[in-house]
Curated annotation (Swiss-Prot):
This is Holliday junction branch migration complex subunit RuvA. Gene3D superfamilies: 5' to 3' exonuclease, C-terminal subdomain, DNA helicase RuvA subunit, C-terminal domain, Nucleic acid-binding proteins. It comes from Endomicrobium trichonymphae. The RuvA-RuvB-RuvC complex processes Holliday junction (HJ) DNA during genetic recombination and DNA repair, while the RuvA-RuvB complex plays an important role in the rescue of blocked DNA replication forks via replication fork reversal (RFR). RuvA specifically binds to HJ cruciform DNA, conferring on it an open structure. The RuvB hexamer acts as an ATP-dependent pump, pulling dsDNA into and through the RuvAB complex. HJ branch migration allows RuvC to scan DNA until it finds its consensus sequence, where it cleaves and resolves the cruciform DNA. Has three domains with a flexible linker between the domains II and III and assumes an 'L' shape. Domain III is highly mobile and contacts RuvB. One of its GO terms (biological process) is DNA repair. GO terms for cellular component: cytoplasm; Holliday junction helicase complex; Holliday junction resolvase complex. Signal peptide: none annotated. InterPro entries: DNA_helicase_Holl-junc_RuvA_I, NA-bd_OB-fold, RuvA, RuvA_2-like, RuvA_C, RuvA_C_sf. The gene is ruvA.
């Protein structure tokens, strides 16, 4: 089982990348979200891997790569838990969700298809399908990139996301909610979630 590959980025395209590891080239499919974070070729890179086998007796092995652990965890959750979703479709969904893993998690837990539509572009049918499949399982996924976020940033991002989700539940548009919550939080960084929602409503 391959956990990650560390080597030199030999080539890259939206169809996939090749990493040279000690003279061996590994072809890896990646979502657009990972592709956009890649360095220029000939630079070192670390990619987290998912192996997939197909064909009789598992004769064909495909590698799927992700820039962060959270991208990989979300991909595996979707592929394994959402009925009828194969590897390629799971990659497509992961790319959409990578806009904000925290907001996606909040939308699933709060059973909010409108939030899934406005932020990530999922149709109502797909949003409902994701909610049913993931509502009892998504809490096990760590959506915080600990290598890049401090504790203060984590608290801020979580609170802001939850407040925005709360306003959307009350019928406000995503853009309205984001502007209100962001403006209120910038002037009240020690605020509680309940007061953040109340003051955001006053702002609106």
């Amino acid at each position: 089982m391959i956990d990650y590959l560390y080597g030199t980025l030999d080539s890259k395209s939206t169809d996939g990348i090749t990493i040279d590891v000690n003279g061996i080239g590994y072809e890896i499919s990646v979502p657009i979200s990972t592709f956009l974070k890649l360095p220029e070729t000939r630079n070192p890179i670390k990619i987290y891997i998912v192996e997939s086998t197909a064909g009789m007796y598992g004769g064909v092995i495909s590698l799927y790569g992700f820039f962060t652990i959270e991208e990989r965890e979300m991909y595996l959750l979707i592929k394994d838990k959402v009925h009828g979703i194969g590897a390629k479709k799971a990659m497509e969904y992961t790319d959409k969700i990578s806009k904000s893993f925290a907001n996606f998690k909040t939308a699933i837990i709060s059973k909010n298809p409108s939030m899934l539509n406005e932020i990530f572009g999922f149709t109502k049918k797909t949003a409902d399908k994701l909610i049913v499949a993931l509502k009892d399982k998504i809490s096990t996924v760590n959506v915080l990139n600990k290598e890049k976020q401090t504790g203060a940033e984590t608290i801020k991002n979580t609170m802001v996301s939850e407040a925005i989700a709360g306003l959307i539940t009350l019928g406000y548009k995503m853009q309205q909610a984001r502007v209100a919550v962001t403006n209120v939080y910038e002037h009240n960084e020690n605020i509680t979630l309940e007061d953040l929602i109340k003051k955001s409503l006053q702002y609106l």
